[in-house]
A protein has these predicted regions:
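Acidic, polar ligand-binding/catalytic clefts
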Residues: 1-51, 121-128, 139
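Bilobed "Venus flytrap"/periplasmic-binding protein-like clamshell domains
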Residues: 15, 33-90, 107-109
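Short active-site oxyanion
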Residues: 54-56, 100-101, 152
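Solvent-exposed, acidic/flexible segments
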Residues: 58-63, 84-88, 103, 138, ...
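Ligand-binding clefts/hinges and TM-proximal coupling segments of bilobed small-molecule sensing domains
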Residues: 64-85, 118, 122-124, 153-182
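Periplasmic-binding protein-like
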Residues: 20, 31-39, 107, 111-154, ...
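A ligand-binding cleft/hinge motif common to bilobed small-molecule-binding domains
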Residues: 4, 12-23, 68-71, 96-130
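Solvent-exposed, polar/charged alpha-helical surfaces in well-ordered, non-transmembrane soluble domains
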Residues: 1, 5, 49, 67-71, ...
């Protein structure tokens, strides 16, 4: 609503065009993040194939992970229960408390979970998907900002700025050579 009302100019925080292509006017993708799943080592869950109707998986509400699971786009039993939470912290808490069997998210918080509790959790060896991130503007936007932002993002990709930022904050994220094209 804030975007539609003009209270803000854009949405730019781990935001993906996936399943939203026609809802917003997008910049070119500037970053690709890897999505995987974490499970307790004692669970026996090592891949999506190990999930059956008795298992539950935590996802962030509104995320690409949630949308793909609900759409049946991933090779997973349709009987797996999907529990949607409002944040990564809530997913992590639900997983730690045993309310869910595993947690699907960007690898960054999953890797932090494994590092914080060595020997307790594992992240699937096979990544589930990659997700392109972009900046979303109101669908009716016609100004020069998107073109200027694409140009700036392309330059930041080309000169290594995005990779340096990613290196500081997001294990498992890369530009994948996708930096916005001018």
């Amino acid at each position: 609503r804030l975007l539609e009302n003009g209270d803000i100019d854009c949405l730019w925080c781990d935001y993906s065009p996936c399943y939203r292509e026609d809802k917003y006017y997008w910049t070119e993708p500037y970053l690709t993040v890897t999505v995987s799943v974490a499970a307790k080592k004692t669970s026996g869950i090592k891949s999506l194939a190990h999930l059956d109707g008795s298992k539950t998986i935590a996802v962030i509400a509104g995320s690409v992970s949630e949308r793909r699971l609900l759409a049946g786009d991933l090779e997973i039993s349709p009987d797996v229960q999907i529990k949607s939470y409002g944040s990564a912290e809530l997913c992590k808490a639900a997983h730690a408390k045993g309310y869910v069997d595993c947690w699907m998210a960007d690898v960054q918080p999953l890797d932090r979970l494994v590092a914080r509790y060595p020997g307790l959790y594992r992240v699937f060896a096979d990544n589930v998907m990659t997700v392109d991130l972009g900046v979303a503007f109101d669908d009716g936007y016609e100004g020069p900002i998107v073109k200027d932002l694409n140009t700036a993002l392309f330059a930041m990709d080309r000169d290594g700025t995005i990779d340096r930022i990613v290196g500081n904050y997001k294990t498992g994220a890369t530009t994948g050579g996708q930096g916005a094209n001018p």
